[in-house]
Amino acid sequence: MAMATQASAATRHLITAAWSPSAKPRPATLAMPSSARGPAPLFAAAPDTPAPAAPPAEPAPAGFVPPQLDPSTPSPIFGGSTGGLLRKAQVEEFYVITWTSPKEQVFEMPTGGAAIMREGPNLLKLARKEQCLALGNRLRSKYKIAYQFYRVFPNGEVQYLHPKDGVYPEKVNAGRQGVGQNFRSIGKNVSPIEVKFTGKNSFDI
């Protein structure tokens, strides 16, 4: 018992020194990897390939002057979103449709939702040509409004697209050249076996 008391007395100063209250505890720090601090901001990489050159525009029919695009034309009043332009708009092209409204009225957007067209000229940017056609057909059928749309390239070049000769395709236009037109019935085509392996179609002969 006395030996145990002497041993504890001999080692008490060591324990006191090791657990001295004067020694301030050091706060533990946790080094977090950069991936745990939150997602890193994403930036769109610049395209490696240069923007393709615009294809040569077809000559306009004689007597028709394509209308010029005015970039200062106001857009319709729309509180929603058209979904933005596609990625290809930065490296290829996007489309612009214009029309002139006799009054301020509500119309349906091809991307969903309703917007208010302004009285006078309107301009709307869309990502696809099919969206311009859908909106244009609606403007002509319901509102009796003529429209035009254009293709805009990344370098700023504007190409007039539709209606190509100033008259919509479903209308007759004197002097318009037919494409793939054959003035005969399908029963008067040659037999397909006669043109097999020739690289031609029965309606081409």
From Swiss-Prot:
InterPro entries: PsaD, PsaD_sf
Main location: plastid
This protein's GO CC annotations: chloroplast thylakoid membrane; photosystem I reaction center
Function: PsaD can form complexes with ferredoxin and ferredoxin-oxidoreductase in photosystem I (PS I) reaction center. PSAD may encode the ferredoxin-docking protein.
Region (Disordered): 18-66
Residues annotated as transit peptide in the record: 1-43
Species: Hordeum vulgare
Induction record: By light.
Biased composition (Low complexity): 39-48
Keywords: Chloroplast, Membrane, Photosynthesis, Photosystem I, Plastid, Thylakoid, Transit peptide
Intracellular or extracellular location(s): Plastid, Chloroplast thylakoid membrane
UniProt similarity note: Belongs to the PsaD family.
The protein, known as: Photosystem I reaction center subunit II, chloroplastic
Biased composition (Pro residues): 49-59
Taxonomy of the source species: Eukaryota, Viridiplantae, Streptophyta, Embryophyta, Tracheophyta
Membrane topology: Peripheral membrane protein
Biological process (GO), any one: photosynthesis
